[in-house]
Amino acid sequence: MKNAAIGAAAVPAFGCSKGGSGASAPAGEMTMRENPKTGEKVSLLGFGCMRWPSLDGRSAREGVGEIDQNAVNELVDRAIAGGVNYFDTSPAYCRGKSERATGIALSRHPREKYFIATKLSNFAPASWTREASIGIYRNSLKELRTDYIDYMLLHGVGMGGGMEEFRARYIDNGILEFLLAERKAGRIRNLGFSYHGDIRVFDYLLSKHDVYKWDFVQIQLNYLDWKHAKQINDRNTDAEYLYGELDKRGIPAVIMEPLLGGRLSNIPHTLVPEFKRREPEMSVASWAFRFAGSFPRVLTVLSGMVKMEHLEDNLRTYSPLKELTREEFAFLEEAAERMMEFNTIPCNDCKYCMPCPYSLDIPAILLHYNKCLNERMVPESRLEPGYARARRAYLVGYDRSVPKLRQASLCTGCEQCVPHCPQRIDIPKELRRIDKYVQNLKRQAALMGDVKKKFAEGGYSCVVGNGEVYTFSRPGIEDLLDLYQNRRPLLKGALVADRAVGKAAASVLAMAGVAELYAEIITRPALEMLDALRIEVSYGKVVPHIKNRAGDGMCPMEEACRDAKTPAECLKILLSKTAAK
């Protein structure tokens, strides 16, 4: 049932309305959506306050520094000036400091100018008592400098222990009844819940809609999760189903993760030109926001905008919304299908897994792996084209993205992170897998070091490493041609160190499929040829051409290949010359 088609009612009539959802918003003005209960106009762009900037230059969710209140104020001021009026926070965000920073920034504006959404974030078992949970709620009012909450959520229902945990957090302690009473008293204007994880909890709460009268529900929705959430992680549920269940009950949807933790702003590089060809002036991220905003039951789409340029980009996207056409919706569905081929880890960078007791930067480790996977920089074998270059890019990028003392090699498998992950990733398993991969890359890099050392110490003309290390002493390209003709498998995926590599030798190496080359001397044409084929090359000196043995002209083999356009053409010339001898 969870993966079944939900019918046309749940899918927006892309391109069929008179100008779409943003038709009522003049050019440059924010698209607004109407709360069906109150009639209030809510900005289609909502401000997610999970990651306020901090004074140490990092997100306050991951850094140790204090929140940069001046930066928060500037972001809030610009958002309100741009038409944003929905601000979503939680007692759990920014190490417990988001509500205070949000309250300070918002209280500088008239209360009627904005809506506050916060959550009863009683995740720790110690906070499941009625007294502790009510204390969390009352502290939210204090921190947010308000006497009422516009949008109150049960936070992360379905996470952790599923139905059993949900009942302990909200039912058995009477907290849901308390919140319903607060709504009746007007201190909560709208009551809903945010959903992650166990679909039984989602279905149960919607089955009780006649009792609880949910005013809104917050779900994860984006063009990858629309049909592929369950494929990404079998314990997740496709957004198509979640939205459809809300739509048929007339419950407004608040959208989280429209960018899937940034993954939809950093899509595989092979897809970027197709997005840019359609909308050259728009960012790749804007497509994900247009997708989420084009569903008519969506009240607002949350975005955690720590940088002003991200805020400005999102304001452009929703001022007003340019609703997706049916053809564009089909394009995004096709793009999602192609993204699924990359098999990325479903980390959304929410950082609920942090801090790690052993100081690992878990999200950074997973996101670096995903980034390299999207860029086709996760090589598995030296036989792959561009292996050595991709290996180097992965290892260098890993050290830049994740300090050595926070890398996957230090994971102890304590599993403290596992129950906190909304995507229910087996984090220790993924960290072990990544570390195994990294260690293998390092071993391969060390093999090239062995080849270069052998070459430097032995005075050889050529050294080839491929499982074992082989040495050669004849001058010129005779050894390489002999290897190509008689022992070609030795060169496939090999690591090679050579005294002098010109266009002729480069052609032999390229056609044989070597993985990596070190040359004491290399010609510019040879370097350009190997670079075009993504073969990693290091060298001592670049020269115009290889000289003959007398030193008074060009090497005959180089001369013969001077006008050859491809490695194959050059190799054909070389083989014909050697056959003629």
Protein language model features and the residues they cover:
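Active-site groove signature of glycoside hydrolases
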Residues: 143-165
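Short Fe-S-cluster ligation motifs
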Residues: 375-414
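Beta/alpha (TIM)-barrel catalytic core signal, keyed to glycine-rich beta->alpha loops juxtaposed to Asp/Glu
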Residues: 29, 157-367, 371-390, 419, ...
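N-terminal binding-site loop/beta-alpha segment at the start of enzyme catalytic domains
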Residues: 2-114, 178, 184
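Acidic (Asp/Glu)-rich catalytic clusters
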Residues: 36-41, 103-113, 141-146, 206-212, ...
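Short, acidic/polar
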Residues: 65-79, 129-143, 197-206, 284-289
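C-terminal binding/interaction regions
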Residues: 527-580
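Conserved mixed alpha/beta catalytic, RNA-binding, or beta-rich assembly cores of soluble enzyme
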Residues: 447-520, 547-554
